């Protein structure tokens, strides 16, 4: 498969940007799914802990991007379980 793509790139050099953008998009999508699977509190890989979101504190950042929130200055406003 890779030889076929390289052969096409040698025959038609105008396809090289297409292959680069497709590869970049596929790599980005894979890395984003890996980030969601490993660092999201909504995903639980441990069956012994059915509620993993209770371990998160108010100053744990798990959003991908937050604009104006300083997580170090947030106070705890929920009870301990």
UniProtKB/Swiss-Prot annotation:
GO terms for molecular function: protein-containing complex binding. Residues 38-81 are mitochondrial intermembrane. One of its GO terms (cellular component) is respiratory chain complex IV. The modification N6-acetyllysine is found at residue 10. It holds the Pfam family B12D. The chain crosses the membrane at residues 15-37. The keyword Secreted does not apply. Signal peptide: none annotated. Its main location: mitochondrion. Keywords: Acetylation, Electron transport, Membrane, Mitochondrion, Mitochondrion inner membrane, Phosphoprotein, Respiratory chain, Transmembrane, Transmembrane helix, Transport. It is a single-pass membrane protein. The modification Phosphoserine is found at residue 66. Residues 1-14 are mitochondrial matrix. It is found in: Mitochondrion inner membrane. Component of the cytochrome c oxidase (complex IV, CIV), a multisubunit enzyme composed of 14 subunits. The complex is composed of a catalytic core of 3 subunits MT-CO1, MT-CO2 and MT-CO3, encoded in the mitochondrial DNA, and 11 supernumerary subunits COX4I, COX5A, COX5B, COX6A, COX6B, COX6C, COX7A, COX7B, COX7C, COX8 and NDUFA4, which are encoded in the nuclear genome. Component of the cytochrome c oxidase, the last enzyme in the mitochondrial electron transport chain which drives oxidative phosphorylation. The respiratory chain contains 3 multisubunit complexes succinate dehydrogenase (complex II, CII), ubiquinol-cytochrome c oxidoreductase (cytochrome b-c1 complex, complex III, CIII) and cytochrome c oxidase (complex IV, CIV), that cooperate to transfer electrons derived from NADH and succinate to molecular oxygen, creating an electrochemical gradient over the inner membrane that drives transmembrane transport and the ATP synthase. Belongs to the complex IV NDUFA4 subunit family. PANTHER family: CYTOCHROME C OXIDASE SUBUNIT NDUFA4, NADH-UBIQUINONE OXIDOREDUCTASE MLRQ SUBUNIT. This is Cytochrome c oxidase subunit NDUFA4. The lineage of its organism: Eukaryota, Metazoa, Chordata, Craniata, Vertebrata. The gene is NDUFA4.
């Amino acid at each position: 498969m890779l030889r076929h793509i390289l052969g096409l790139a040698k025959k038609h050099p105008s396809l090289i940007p297409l292959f680069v953008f497709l590869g970049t998009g596929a790599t980005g999508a894979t890395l984003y799914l890996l980030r969601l699977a490993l660092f999201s509190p909504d995903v639980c890989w441990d069956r012994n802990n059915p509620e993993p979101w209770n371990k998160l504190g108010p100053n744990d950042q798990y959003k991908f991007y937050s604009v104006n929130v300083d997580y170090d200055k947030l106070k705890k406003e929920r009870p301990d379980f």
